[in-house]
């Protein structure tokens, strides 16, 4: 809000009000991020607990239990592979997401340039831009570009579980939980 007020060359009284609004917005965003991180961490732990309970129900996998608790030897190669694969998945999804944002931004830039070229009067404020087209580009790009990260997030645990087994999947879930929570905490936005 403050930046818009400054670009519009509004008076200092307006800027004073928008600075307060910016401050409230930034505080709200920081609090919401904390809640999002906390809920994601609890959800990941709940999924890991559900995995452990399913192990307990499966007679073929009860060898992973000691006194009713899931126990995994961290020195086993399959478990180590699972941990490393799990620790890399949040970074892979993050990379795909950043690439998706970049592609969507370039599509938006091309559309805005096209509108400046083809719609007379936009720069002077007499012509009306096609806002709906920009919203349409954003929506379609978001859906299209986020499919691959979604497939990785859903498919990776299945692939690890079926190809490497339950012990590797336990390591995978531990790795993805630890690195995912840390990535969420230390990512700037």
Swiss-Prot record:
- Which EC number(s) does the record attach to this protein? 7.2.3.1
What one GO molecular function would you report for this record? Answer: inorganic diphosphate phosphatase activity
Q: Which cofactor does it need?
A: Mg(2+)
Any keyword Membrane?
Answer: yes
Q: Which reaction does it catalyse?
A: Na(+)(in) + diphosphate + H2O = Na(+)(out) + 2 phosphate + H(+)
Q: Which residues does this entry assign to the site Determinant of potassium dependence?
A: 29
Q: How does it sit in the membrane?
A: Multi-pass membrane protein
The alphabetized UniProt keywords are: Cell inner membrane, Cell membrane, Ion transport, Magnesium, Membrane, Potassium, Sodium, Sodium transport, Translocase, Transmembrane, Transmembrane helix, Transport
Q: What does the UniProt record note about how this protein's activity is regulated?
A: Requires K(+) for maximal activity.
- Reading the lineage from the top rank, the first entry is Bacteria
Task: List S-S links within the chain.
Answer: none
Per UniProt, subcellular location reads as: Cell inner membrane
Annotated transmembrane regions: 31-51, 78-98, 146-166, 168-188
Q: Which biological processes are named by the entry's GO terms?
A: sodium ion transport
Name the GO cellular-component terms: plasma membrane
Q: Which PANTHER family match?
A: K(+)-INSENSITIVE PYROPHOSPHATE-ENERGIZED PROTON PUMP
Record text on subunit structure and interactions: Homodimer.
Please describe what this protein does. Answer: Sodium pump that utilizes the energy of pyrophosphate hydrolysis as the driving force for Na(+) movement across the membrane.
User: Family per UniProt?
Assistant: Belongs to the H(+)-translocating pyrophosphatase (TC 3.A.10) family. K(+)-stimulated subfamily.
* Annotated protein name in UniProt: Putative K(+)-stimulated pyrophosphate-energized sodium pump
What is the protein's species of origin?
A: Rhizobium radiobacter
Q: What is this organism's lineage?
A: Bacteria, Pseudomonadati, Pseudomonadota, Alphaproteobacteria, Hyphomicrobiales
């Amino acid at each position: 809000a403050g930046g818009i007020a400054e670009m519009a060359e509004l008076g200092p009284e307006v800027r004073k009000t928008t600075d307060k609004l910016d401050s409230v917005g930034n505080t709200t965003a920081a609090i919401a991020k904390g809640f999002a991180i906390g809920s994601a961490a609890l959800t990941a732990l709940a999924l890991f607990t559900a995995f452990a309970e399913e192990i307990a129900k499966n007679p073929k996998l009860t060898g992973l239990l000691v006194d009713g608790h899931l126990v995994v030897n961290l020195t086993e190669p399959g478990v180590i592979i699972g941990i490393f694969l799990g620790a890399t998945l949040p970074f892979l999804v993050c990379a795909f997401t950043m690439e998706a944002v970049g592609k969507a931004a370039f599509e938006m830039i091309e559309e805005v340039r096209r509108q400046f070229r083809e719609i007379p009067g936009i720069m002077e404020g007499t012509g009306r831009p096609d806002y709906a087209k920009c919203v349409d580009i954003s929506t379609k790009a978001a859906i299209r570009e986020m499919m691959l990260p979604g497939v990785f997030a859903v498919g990776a645990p299945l692939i690890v579980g079926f190809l490497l087994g339950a012990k590797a999947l336990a390591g995978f879930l531990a790795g993805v939980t630890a690195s995912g929570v840390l990535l969420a905490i230390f990512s700037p936005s």
